Amino acid sequence: MTPDWHSSLILTAYILIFLTGLPANLLALRAFVSRVRQPQPAPVHILLLNLTLADLLLLLLLPFRIVEAASNFRWYLPKIVCALTGFGFYSSIYCSTWLLAGISIERYLGVAFPVQYKLSRRPLYGVIAALVAWIMSFGHCTIVIIVQYLNSTEQVGTENQITCYENFTQAQLDVVLPVRLELCLVLFFVPMTVTIFCYWRFVWIMLTQPHVGAQRRRRAVGLAVVTLLNFLVCFGPYNMSHLVGFHLRQSPSWRVEAVVFSSLNASLDPLLFYFSSSVVRRAFGKGLLLLRNPGSSMLGRGAEETVEGTKTDRGGSQTEGAQSSDFVTE
């Protein structure tokens, strides 16, 4: 079946997100895994690693969306595949919102209370925060999947064509729409509010401290801007569809396009990784060099780069006031 122009646009967007997001997140994954394996990793690196895993989960499920768009949003796979891919896809989105909030809290505490934070922080705190984000997203999305699985695929029209998560009876909407509203409030507006407050204070401190260099200030502003774009551009339209749907008592017609914007998060997060960690900046630099010189071996130099990156992180962090943080003021 040849996709129409609307499906073709969405198909193109999904393919571009997949092609740009997958290699960038794999590079970031390699960098964060090597960093977390070192003794006493910083909580922020644990959170960034989990954010990378959430992005990769979304990207690995994106081919199902690509196939669906190529089929004019007709679902030809088994019913359970629709339920499981939807569960994983939306869980990764909502896990990302709270992980972003956790990263913003870590950044704010690191610059507002550098000495106290350096003395009190533990890797366990990052693990606990990441687990809470995953449990909250999986738990909430499980509720939606249980409701939607009763109608995860439905016959539409007169040609026995099947769609995935698009058609619901009014009785099902009476359950689904309030749950979506709760998702929007708890897993979007609350973490976005926390993130905006933390980055507002974070950027203000970085810009008003006279001993903070211009490069660190630019990275601080870039980190805040990319995170804000994530919430407003990527997650915003999809969650606004929850509010509009609850008001109209039906899913809005533009919900499919909103889901595409939420997928864009997987391509935007690598920019956040770039501003957040010198390990990732070096990994991206090495990756660009490898693209220019295909004959060189990334794997062959992986261990050497990891050791070098770890030493640089530690040295730079100790100078700035806390291990493994690019933004801790003295």
Curated annotation (Swiss-Prot):
<dbReference type="GO" id="GO:0002879">
    <property type="term" value="P:positive regulation of acute inflammatory response to non-antigenic stimulus"/>
</dbReference>
<feature type="topological domain" description="Cytoplasmic">
    <location>
        <begin position="277"/>
        <end position="330"/>
    </location>
</feature>
<protein>
    <recommendedName>
        <fullName>Free fatty acid receptor 2</fullName>
    </recommendedName>
</protein>
<keyword id="KW-0395">Inflammatory response</keyword>
<dbReference type="GO" id="GO:0032757">
    <property type="term" value="P:positive regulation of interleukin-8 production"/>
</dbReference>
<keyword id="KW-0446">Lipid-binding</keyword>
<dbReference type="GO" id="GO:0005886">
    <property type="term" value="C:plasma membrane"/>
</dbReference>
<feature type="transmembrane region" description="Helical; Name=3">
    <location>
        <begin position="80"/>
        <end position="100"/>
    </location>
</feature>
<dbReference type="GO" id="GO:0046676">
    <property type="term" value="P:negative regulation of insulin secretion"/>
</dbReference>
<feature type="glycosylation site" description="N-linked (GlcNAc...) asparagine">
    <location>
        <position position="151"/>
    </location>
</feature>
<feature type="topological domain" description="Extracellular">
    <location>
        <begin position="148"/>
        <end position="184"/>
    </location>
</feature>
<feature type="glycosylation site" description="N-linked (GlcNAc...) asparagine">
    <location>
        <position position="167"/>
    </location>
</feature>
<feature type="transmembrane region" description="Helical; Name=4">
    <location>
        <begin position="127"/>
        <end position="147"/>
    </location>
</feature>
<dbReference type="GO" id="GO:0090276">
    <property type="term" value="P:regulation of peptide hormone secretion"/>
</dbReference>
<feature type="topological domain" description="Cytoplasmic">
    <location>
        <begin position="206"/>
        <end position="219"/>
    </location>
</feature>
<keyword id="KW-0472">Membrane</keyword>
<dbReference type="GO" id="GO:0002673">
    <property type="term" value="P:regulation of acute inflammatory response"/>
</dbReference>
<dbReference type="GO" id="GO:0002720">
    <property type="term" value="P:positive regulation of cytokine production involved in immune response"/>
</dbReference>
<feature type="region of interest" description="Disordered">
    <location>
        <begin position="300"/>
        <end position="330"/>
    </location>
</feature>
<dbReference type="GO" id="GO:0008289">
    <property type="term" value="F:lipid binding"/>
</dbReference>
<comment type="similarity">
    <text>Belongs to the G-protein coupled receptor 1 family.</text>
</comment>
<dbReference type="InterPro" id="IPR017452">
    <property type="entry name" value="GPCR_Rhodpsn_7TM"/>
</dbReference>
<feature type="compositionally biased region" description="Basic and acidic residues">
    <location>
        <begin position="302"/>
        <end position="314"/>
    </location>
</feature>
<dbReference type="GO" id="GO:0042593">
    <property type="term" value="P:glucose homeostasis"/>
</dbReference>
<feature type="transmembrane region" description="Helical; Name=2">
    <location>
        <begin position="44"/>
        <end position="64"/>
    </location>
</feature>
<dbReference type="GO" id="GO:0002232">
    <property type="term" value="P:leukocyte chemotaxis involved in inflammatory response"/>
</dbReference>
<dbReference type="GO" id="GO:0007200">
    <property type="term" value="P:phospholipase C-activating G protein-coupled receptor signaling pathway"/>
</dbReference>
<dbReference type="GO" id="GO:1990806">
    <property type="term" value="P:ligand-gated ion channel signaling pathway"/>
</dbReference>
<comment type="subunit">
    <text>Interacts with FCN1 (via Fibrinogen C-terminal domain).</text>
</comment>
<keyword id="KW-0807">Transducer</keyword>
<feature type="topological domain" description="Extracellular">
    <location>
        <begin position="241"/>
        <end position="255"/>
    </location>
</feature>
<dbReference type="Pfam" id="PF00001">
    <property type="entry name" value="7tm_1"/>
</dbReference>
<keyword id="KW-1133">Transmembrane helix</keyword>
<keyword id="KW-0812">Transmembrane</keyword>
<dbReference type="GO" id="GO:0032722">
    <property type="term" value="P:positive regulation of chemokine production"/>
</dbReference>
<feature type="transmembrane region" description="Helical; Name=6">
    <location>
        <begin position="220"/>
        <end position="240"/>
    </location>
</feature>
<dbReference type="GO" id="GO:0042995">
    <property type="term" value="C:cell projection"/>
</dbReference>
<keyword id="KW-0297">G-protein coupled receptor</keyword>
<dbReference type="GO" id="GO:0002385">
    <property type="term" value="P:mucosal immune response"/>
</dbReference>
<feature type="topological domain" description="Cytoplasmic">
    <location>
        <begin position="101"/>
        <end position="126"/>
    </location>
</feature>
<feature type="transmembrane region" description="Helical; Name=5">
    <location>
        <begin position="185"/>
        <end position="205"/>
    </location>
</feature>
<keyword id="KW-0675">Receptor</keyword>
